Structures are given as C-alpha cells and as structure tokens.
C-alpha cells in the first residue's frame, strides 16, 4: 500500500500547510480551533508506604510451593483458554497451549501474516500490580520487563529496537497519594522505554479503580500498568516454547536480565504468607537489559535454544516446573549452589530473568560472556520424572506430576462455575490421561510436490469450487486457501448471491459450507442459515439442483456441519435426521484434539483411513445426536477419547464426522482447514520437522482428484 510522509509534529501550537511554491495557505494557531482552556493542575500529597518485610523458613519450602502454585496469578489458566476460539483464521502460529497434554504455558502469541510466508506478529503482556504497591516506579519497570521477557522467545525482525509497547493504566486515581504514585509510575515507564530505545505509541487508562460501599468502606485496586509488547517475527517456525525437549543431558541455563539484587518483595511467596515486603525486584540498568534481550535473540536465531521460559509470577521454581508440566516424561537435576542467596530467595524471587535449555553450552557461554551478560548453568535434563534441587548441602526432590495437579486445581475450582462440577471434574481427572499421539498414513511424505501442490501457484486450474458464506461465518479464508492449495479455483459465494439468483452453482463441482457463527447463532446453530435456503426459492433451487447431480462433492465444517445436518443433506433418505445439540459442558469448547479416522469410503478421507491425527475444535453446539442405530450411519471420524474433554461435546459414539452413503458429502465438526500446515498444529510430531504440509491437505487433494 502507498505510504506518504505528509508532515511533522512541532511544539509551535499551530496547524500549518505549506504549498510547493513555499507559500503558506494555512497557518492557524490551535487556539483558534480548540479554544484556550486552562491547563488542568492536579495537586496531591506523596504517601510513604511501610509494609512488613518477609520472614520465611527453608524447612517450609514444600508448603510455600504448594500455596504458590494454587495462587490464581500462578495457577493453570485452562479454565480461561478452553472457552475461546484459539484457531480462527488459520493463521495462529502460537497460542496459549503447548505440549502433548496441551497446557496453557506459552510465553507469547504469534499470528502469521499470511499462509505462504514465514513472517508473523508476536504479542506478549506484562504487569506487576503487587510490586507497584510497594514501589510504583519499580513495579512499572517490571511490567515492561515481563512483557519483553515473554516476547523474546520469538525471533523479532530488528530485535528490541523494532518492538512497540502499549500501556494500559489501571489506577485508583484521585485518592490521597495515588495521583502522585501514578505520576511517578508514568515518568518511570517513559524514561525506561526511552533508555531501552523502544516506543509506546498507544495505550489507554482506567483511572477510576475505586469501589465504594454503602457502609463507607472503600477498596482501592492496586495501581498498575499493563504492558502489551508487539514485534514482527522474522520466522514463525523458529519461535521457542517453554516445553522442555526430551534430550537427556541437555543443559539448563539461568540468564539474568535485571542486573539487580534478588528480592522477594511483591512476590507470589509474599502473598501466600500475607506479607508484601519492603524491597521489590527492579531493572537496574536498561542498557544491560537491552543487551541481554538482543543476545538471547541472536542465540534463538542461530538455533542454539531448545526451550525457554521467563521468570515471573511464582519465581524460578515455578519456571522450572512449568517447563516440565506440558510433558509426560523426563525431569531435571538442578544445582543452585552458585547463588549466594538462601534457598527460598533463589527459588521464589521474581527478578526479570529466563531459563533456557541448550544441547551444548559452548556457544551460549561464549556469546553471553562476550556481551557481559550474567548467567549460571544450573542443571540438566534427566530421565526420572522429578526435579531434584540442590543448594549446598540441602537437596529437595519435587514430584512433577503431583505438583502439576496442584497447579491445575485452581483452574478446576473456577471451571466448576462455568462447566458445572461433573464436567469440571472430568477435565481435571482426564487432562493428563488424554495425551496427544499420532499415527500418520504410511504413504504420507509431508512434501507438497508429492501431492501435486504448488505452494506458490498463481495461475488458474480451471477446476471450480465455491465457499458458501452467510453473515457471521468466520472460517472462509483459511478454507479457501486450503482449497486453492489443492488446486481449485475458489469462488466466494454469499447467501445473498444465491437468494438473488446471481449464482446458481451450475458451474461448481465442489462446495464448502464454512465454520463460524452464522446470524450470531441467535436462532440456534445454523438454524437461520438453513432457513435462508428453505424459504428463499432461488437459493433452494440452486441447492437442490446441486445435490441432484452425480458429479458434485460437498463439505461442511463446524457451522457448515450444523447446516448440512439441519438440512438433512447427508442422509436425505432418513425420515428423521440427526441433531446437533449443545455441548454437554454447556459452554463453548476450544481445543486441539486427537481424531481417529475409521475405515471409510469417503472421497475426501478414504486414503487417511486408519490414521490418528489431530486438529482444532471450536464450537458450542457440536454434539451429534442420532435417532437410529450406529449401523445406519457412515461415521468416518471419531474423537480418539470417548470421555470429556477428549470428546469435547459428548457426541454419540464419539462421532466427529459423518458422510453420505456414496461418500461424496461430508460433515464434520473439527476444523481440518486450520491444520493443513505443521506450524498450525500446537503440537506436531517431533520427528517430522521437515514436513511442508500436514496430512489434512490430502482431504482437499482427494477432492480435487475426484472432481
């Protein structure tokens, strides 16, 4: 898109337009347009806080750890992430969840810019409200630091200087001492960002964070700034996950980003023992921080980093545990004897820092020493499923799986409020039992050319297909690209085109009803969309004529599956059609689930028979309910696990997809069009890193071959 430099900002309080001949047709003082209102002057008194320092005992390490892992800021956020669509657009390269049991542990999110290239946009957040209670300036700097130690795991084009921040101020302003604290916090953020060499071009504020009650009680929210950091990703395939790679003997390295003494003030540990503390973590040297950020970026770009995680809420011990939680095997041997501080301070401090996993420390040590970055080699990956922590003569052994259940428990308690006790308990009981596993077809090479796919195709193939859209759907673009990749020339057909007669589908051999929320699901899933076909003569005629032909294929995904079921398009010979009911959990479900493809004669899925794959689900009404016995249906795909959440909706016989008796018409709830590239999978077989496409692309290639 064209971009033009049309002017510059000055401090002359005037709006000036200069012509090419150096004349000045417009030269207005801003006061002529906006008046000259008086400047607002806020007067406040600085209040000096005096919080109790922390007192702790090494002997209570396990007690402290259990309480910290249950703290909402530290505990599992599964109850939040499982109810929002994390795959829509098909451009999600990294979302919250990672690993074979898909736990929400990722440091950042990444959206691909398109389906062909490697570039993307990364975003991460940081906040530090408890630190800011003690020290508004330090807490605000820590918020920026946390956002950046989360963002650093994506290879940012231009490194730190190319990052932009957004600042969202949440503050109980206009209360005694709070305006003064806010002023100091804003000033600290401004200076820190300038010293880092990054900009804050946008943000917002909510300065009424005070709750007053009829009995006279007043509650202040802790003043904090929530920082969102954004940067362009050079290669989405090189982003680093916190999940430890199962490489025995690989090393774990602690890298300091703060250049500051280790402090426990404002920490999660302080909260669980009901003390704030006097001294908080801080970043002593912005240039040092920037240097550490850019050095780690280089190591990531050079392929030296296997896994990595920031240290923030919960401290170093939480970081180490979380790096193990999303796996089901292996552990760590950790030795922190090189730290001068005591065991509790080392393991629970939240100073800005990271832990990385590397195969060989040689290059990492050389780079960090050359740049003057403080680091310590603290351990290695071991086979026993535990974390062994040594500090001088002390040794503590942590049961990773037991502590993971404790960490997940808070999510389970909160989930009861939305899924109900039964299904919240099912999720809590089964999350660790429903590990993702794969059995790819033996013929699948992962190479695009082996399927006749030209990844950069521009010319027409002459084989027409159509996306059928209704207002509210949102899965059309990823579906269109999957079809295009397979070799179709894809036409965009909206329901208004069919209703008005502009399209009649006579030149189309393959139609796809896409996913989303047609008509906002106001009438129920796809009920309004079905009505648009049933009660509009031209649309109904076009649909009936299409299905009367013997040379046609159709696919319905998610909302499209609900539509095909509502219209009875899969089994028109049945007097009573299947129904799509609300999920048994009574809420929207989003997840990456295992699927077994049964032996079948479906045009699109036949040569994937016997496979175990995985893809995204995102629906609120995905439960197949069948009026007849099992043998009356061609159930081509099932959820690999019969119980929730592996079967996310409670479908009869764990059904995920059905097809017509002749194999030409397929309806499925999972989104195969959001997983045709390996980078779209949040967990892909580790021995298939060279794959260009995933097995799901074969469904579209099969459709093209048949047509």
Q: Which positions does each model-derived feature cover?
A:
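Glycine/proline-enriched, intrinsically flexible loops and inter-domain linkers
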Residues: 1-510, 514, 519, 532-544, ...
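Short, well-ordered, mixed-charge alpha-helical segments that flank or form enzyme active sites
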Residues: 13-15, 208-210, 236, 562-566, ...
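FAD-binding core of FAD-dependent oxidoreductases
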Residues: 313-316, 560-563, 615
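A structural signal for short, well-ordered beta-strand segments and their strand-loop junctions
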Residues: 5, 254, 555-557, 667-668
């Amino acid at each position: 898109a064209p971009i033009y430099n049309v002017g510059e900002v000055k401090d002359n309080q005037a709006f000036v337009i200069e012509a090419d001949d150096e004349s000045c047709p417009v030269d207005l003082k801003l006061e002529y347009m906006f008046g000259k209102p008086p400047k607002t002057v806020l007067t406040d008194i600085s209040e000096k806080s005096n919080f109790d320092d922390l007192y702790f005992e090494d002997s209570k390490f396990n007690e402290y750890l259990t309480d910290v892992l249950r703290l909402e800021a530290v505990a599992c956020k599964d109850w939040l992430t499982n109810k929002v669509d994390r795959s829509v657009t098909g451009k999600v390269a990294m979302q919250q969840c990672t690993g074979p049991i898909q736990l929400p542990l990722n440091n950042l999110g990444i959206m691909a810019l398109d389906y062909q290239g490697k570039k993307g946009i990364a975003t991460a957040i940081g906040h530090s409200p408890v630190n800011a209670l003690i020290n508004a300036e330090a807490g605000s700097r820590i918020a920026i630091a946390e956002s950046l130690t989360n963002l650093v795991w994506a290879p940012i084009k231009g490194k730190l200087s190319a990052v932009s921040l957004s600042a969202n101020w949440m503050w109980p302003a206009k209360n005694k001492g709070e305006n003064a604290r806010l002023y100091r916090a804003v000033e600290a953020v401004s200076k820190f960002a300038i010293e880092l060499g990054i900009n804050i071009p946008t943000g917002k504020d909510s300065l009424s964070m005070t709750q007053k009650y009829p009995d006279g009680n007043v509650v202040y929210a802790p003043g904090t700034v929530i920082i969102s950091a954004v940067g362009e990703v050079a290669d989405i395939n090189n982003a680093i996950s916190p999940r430890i790679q199962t490489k025995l003997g690989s090393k774990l390295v602690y890298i300091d980003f703060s250049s500051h003494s280790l402090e426990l003030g404002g920490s999660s540990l302080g909260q669980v023992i009901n003390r704030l503390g006097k001294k908080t973590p801080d970043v002593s040297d912005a240039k040092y921080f920037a240097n550490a950020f850019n050095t780690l970026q280089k190591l990531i770009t050079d392929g030296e980093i296997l896994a990595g995680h920031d240290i923030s809420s919960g401290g170093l011990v939480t970081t180490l545990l979380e790096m193990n939680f999303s796996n089901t095997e292996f552990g760590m041997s950790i030795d922190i004897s090189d730290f001068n501080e005591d065991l509790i301070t080392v393991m629970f401090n939240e100073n800005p820092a990271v832990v990385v996993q590397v195969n060989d420390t040689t290059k990492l040590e050389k780079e960090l020493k050359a740049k003057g970055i403080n680091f310590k080699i603290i351990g290695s990956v071991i086979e026993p499923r535990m974390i062994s922590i040594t500090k001088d003569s002390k040794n503590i052994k942590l049961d990773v799986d037991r502590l993971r259940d404790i960490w997940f428990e808070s999510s389970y308690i909160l989930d009861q409020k939305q899924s109900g006790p039964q299904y919240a308990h099912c999720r809590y009981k089964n999350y660790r039992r429903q590990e993702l596993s794969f059995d790819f077809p033996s013929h699948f090479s992962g190479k695009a050319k082996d399927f006749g796919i030209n990844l950069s195709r521009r010319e027409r193939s002459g084989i027409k297909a159509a996306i059928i859209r209704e207002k509210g759907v949102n899965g059309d673009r990823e579906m269109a690209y999957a079809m295009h990749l397979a070799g179709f020339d894809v036409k965009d057909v909206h329901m208004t085109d069919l209703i008005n007669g502009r399209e009649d589908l006579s030149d189309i051999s393959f139609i796809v009803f896409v996913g989303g929320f047609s008509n906002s699901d106001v009438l129920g899933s796809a009920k309004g969309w079905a009505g648009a076909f049933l009660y509009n003569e031209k649309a109904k005629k076009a649909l009936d004529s299409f299905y009367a032909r013997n040379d046609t294929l159709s696919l319905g995904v998610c909302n499209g599956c609900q539509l095909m079921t509502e219209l009875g398009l899969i089994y028109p010979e049945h007097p009573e059609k299947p129904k799509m009911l609300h999920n048994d959990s009574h809420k929207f479900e989003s997840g990456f689930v295992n699927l077994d493809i049964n032996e079948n004669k479906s045009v699109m899925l036949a040569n994937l028979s016997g496979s175990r794959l995985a893809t995204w689900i995102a629906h609120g009404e995905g439960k197949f309910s069948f009026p007849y016995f099992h043998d009356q249906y061609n159930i081509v795909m099932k959820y690999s696990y019969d119980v929730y959440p592996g079967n996310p909706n409670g479908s009869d016989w764990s059904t995920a997809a059905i097809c017509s008796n002749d194999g030409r018409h397929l309806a499925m709830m999972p989104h195969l069009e959001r997983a045709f590239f390996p980078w779209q999978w949040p967990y892909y077989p580790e021995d298939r890193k060279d794959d260009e496409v995933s097995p799901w692309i074969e469904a579209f290639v099969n459709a093209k071959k048949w047509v």
